[in-house]
Amino acid sequence: MKERLFIISQYLLPHHLLSRLAGCIAECRVRWFKNAFTTWFAKRYQVDMSQALVEDVTAYEHFNAFFTRALKDGARPLDQTPGAILSPADGAISQLGPIEHGRIFQAKGHSFSVLELLGGDAANAAPFMGGEFATVYLSPKDYHRVHMPLAGTLREMVYIPGRIFSVNQTTAENVPELFARNERVACIFDTERGPMAVVLVGAMIVASIETVWAGLVTPPKRELKTFRYDEAARAPIHLEKGAELGRFKLGSTAIVLFGPDQVKWVEELKAGSPVQMGQALAQSNA
């Protein structure tokens, strides 16, 4: 009964209004308030600050600065195995595996379309048909910057408006096509393994998504918007393996897509496996 009421509330709550209010709170610079809130949050979610570049939670100018905190040098060493494909973020594997019939497995009884995930552009979706996916969920306690699994040159970024359902096991099991309905930013790169997509999926209370090349990605009007970076008028944007790609101001999910026969997932990884940015998720196929 409790789970059912929670799911019903997900459809009734004013998602974007709540996220705007959360954004105001997260950017508040009133010292006593931001210190109290940040301290409470760190204790409530058992945030490990020992690896943070700034360990004192009260030293951040606002909650968002704390939430998107940088880590100390060496805190996330990159797997040096030749051909390793890195985890883009700290978190847990929600699902990973093959893309079958153009759909990505979400949870028992649920899947979603690659085409819809990437904003409805068939040309963007086509290279990933029959390919592979990995979905990494970032919990509140995690490091919330997203990094490159593989070196790549940015071809296109697509902002896709949508709902902002909470993202957790309950919603994954009960909200159809959850990740293709939530607001998200799809980044498509050209890599040595062919096209790679990294999709940053928002969630309720996620105030914003940023990328290192565009900053805050929320167009004034919440409508689908495509930004192309392979045109002569724009300087190429190349990011090395392990380089920061973007960040969540309050977190959610990163989904990585590859084409057919390009990668093989690490056998030990399965749904629920904890991962850290920089560890190997997969190995390039020869």
Curated annotation (Swiss-Prot):
Active site per UniProt: D90 (charge relay system), H147 (charge relay system), S252 (charge relay system), S252 (schiff-base intermediate with substrate)
Pyruvic acid (Ser): residues carrying this PTM: S252
Annotated cofactor note: Binds 1 pyruvoyl group covalently per subunit.
Chemical reaction(s) catalysed: a 1,2-diacyl-sn-glycero-3-phospho-L-serine + H(+) = a 1,2-diacyl-sn-glycero-3-phosphoethanolamine + CO2
Membrane topology annotation: Peripheral membrane protein
Localization: Cell membrane
InterPro entries xref list: PS_Dcarbxylase (IPR003817), PSD-B (IPR033177), PSD_type1_pro (IPR033178)
Class of enzymatic activity (EC top level): lyase
Gene Ontology biological process terms in this record: phosphatidylethanolamine biosynthetic process
Post-translational modification: Is synthesized initially as an inactive proenzyme. Formation of the active enzyme involves a self-maturation process in which the active site pyruvoyl group is generated from an internal serine residue via an autocatalytic post-translational modification. Two non-identical subunits are generated from the proenzyme in this reaction, and the pyruvate is formed at the N-terminus of the alpha chain, which is derived from the carboxyl end of the proenzyme.
HAMAP family: PS_decarb_PSD_B_type1 (MF_00662)
Family under the similarity heading: Belongs to the phosphatidylserine decarboxylase family. PSD-B subfamily. Prokaryotic type I sub-subfamily.
Subunit (UniProt): Heterodimer of a large membrane-associated beta subunit and a small pyruvoyl-containing alpha subunit.
Protein name: Phosphatidylserine decarboxylase proenzyme
Organism: Pseudomonas fluorescens (strain Pf0-1)
